[in-house]
Amino acid sequence: MISSKTSFIALIGNPVSHSLSPIMQNAALQYLGLDLIYIAIQCRDEDLELVLNSLKKINCKGLNI
């Protein structure tokens, strides 16, 4: 269950909508009992710096590209 203490990790790229990573990673995270979620973030090349800086500010725990 997602709470105010839940952290996140993400897949970032363009495109990411086809990726099965969020399904697989979230199943593994839940199985392990970790308070993390894995999300996919669509990001255009020209927005990469802005997105990365924003993710730092909201304490993203890790990224896959």
Over which residues does each language-model region extend?
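N-terminal ligand-binding/catalytic initiation module
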Residues: 1-65
